[in-house]
Structures are given as structure tokens and as C-alpha cells.
Amino acid sequence: KITGHIDYEERYACSSAAGGLKMISIGLVPELTAQASREASLGAGAKVWKTYSFNLTKGDMREIEEYHPDIILLTGGTDGGNSECILYNAQMLSSLSYDCPIVIAGNRCAAEECQEILGERTTFLCENVMPKLGELNIEPTQKQIREIFLKRIVQGKGLSEASDLVSGIIMPTPSAMLTAMELLSDGWEELSGIGELVGVDLGGATTDIYSIAEGSPANMGTVMKGIQEPYAKRSVEGDIGMRYSVHGILEAVGDRRLSK
């Protein structure tokens, strides 16, 4: 047993921050900007509760109020394309009863007007997550989401004091896992990586899947449709885990199969 003062050269800590980062994403078309919005949120380490498409309804707003997300990602339209939807949704979000940080990453021709509509609410302007049809640009938005997480959410959950006690950086656990997968795949400095990979992170409440790959089809005659998949990707099964969400496994496989 050791008592008294202990000198540390470095201190490291690993913890899931009180349930993680709760987000909702809003886009225009489900298969395009709404999907791009979701990819940006998941890649930043967020738990995406729901993705909304087209114009928000009063029922949608009641759901958002009830869920009380930490961050809202507002997207919609390619640059120079549809602007009516994102402007309408900005107007709907202006009625929120609390000041939730809103990241605006849609049609650049409407972004500043969205910010004006939202008035004194906390907003952040980012590059469009889909500037051209089928073209993803999610890295700037992911960076902004991580910064909001560290500056606002971490402080709000009482972890700002912990940052003074540990060495290195503080980052969301899913984001750290994605970075680790990229290092394992691509290597670092003189160390070679192992190449394309799929990683599975089994948690108590969720199961995260990480993919580091170009995703190019093996058959040269394959025609690609939809948005381009990111090289480094995270997806999450929010209702399948080893402890808190173990009921999700039971529902997915059935009690008879699980008993075997």
C-alpha cells in the first residue's frame, strides 16, 4: 500500500463522458444531404439520435425539445442549389426553448441568412457537407463538432477540471477510436500500417463499427450510385450493447437462437 505524495511523469485517463455527445442531424433529401449530415455527425464521435429530412414539422420540433440534444447539425442543399428547405428549418429551430449549439453546414448561399434567422442563438458556420451532388466534404464540420464538444459539453459535464490533471489531449471516445483505427491502418511516421480494416468496438450500451477503406468496387463494371463513402467511417448500433442495451441483442437474434 502506497500513501502520501506520489510524483507522476505523465497521467492518462479514459472515460465515456456521461453518455457521450447527443446530436440530431437535419438535411434535405434522405439519400443525399441528410445522409451526409449523419456521416459528419457519426465521424465526429456523436450519438445521432435521429436524422430529419425535408421540412421540419411541429411534431419534429416536439421530438427535438423532448430529446434535448447537445448539438444540432443543420444542412441542406448543394452550393447554389435548394435554399428554401434549410431556411425554413432554421426558422423552425429559432423557436427552440433552450440555446442548443447549431452547426450550419448547408448551401453556402443560404448559410448566413440561416444564422440571421437564428438570431442570438449559438451558431457556427461551416463549409457545406455536400457542396456538389454526391461529393462529401465532412471534415470541417467534424472538426467544429469536436471543438464544441470540448469547449461546451465537457465543461458543462464537470470534466474541465480533469483536463488539468491529465497529460495530453481530451477527445470523445468514438473520435479517439476512429483516430486509432486510422493509425493502425495507415501507420505513423516510419511505421507501416496494416492496410484496409474493419474494427468493432463492443460497449455496454452501443456497438460501434469502424471502416478504414477506399471502398472501391472489385468489379470494374460496377456503377456507383449515391454519395461517396468516406475513407474513414464510423457507424453505430445504438440499441445493441453488452450491458445496458443487452436487450437489443435478444430482440435481434431471438431468445431461442441466443440460448444455443
Residue ranges with predicted function:
Residues 85, 115, 160-199, 207-260:
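Helical "lid/coupling" subdomains associated with nucleotide-phosphate turnover
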Residues 1-196:
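Nucleotide/phosphate-binding catalytic cleft detector across ATP-hydrolyzing
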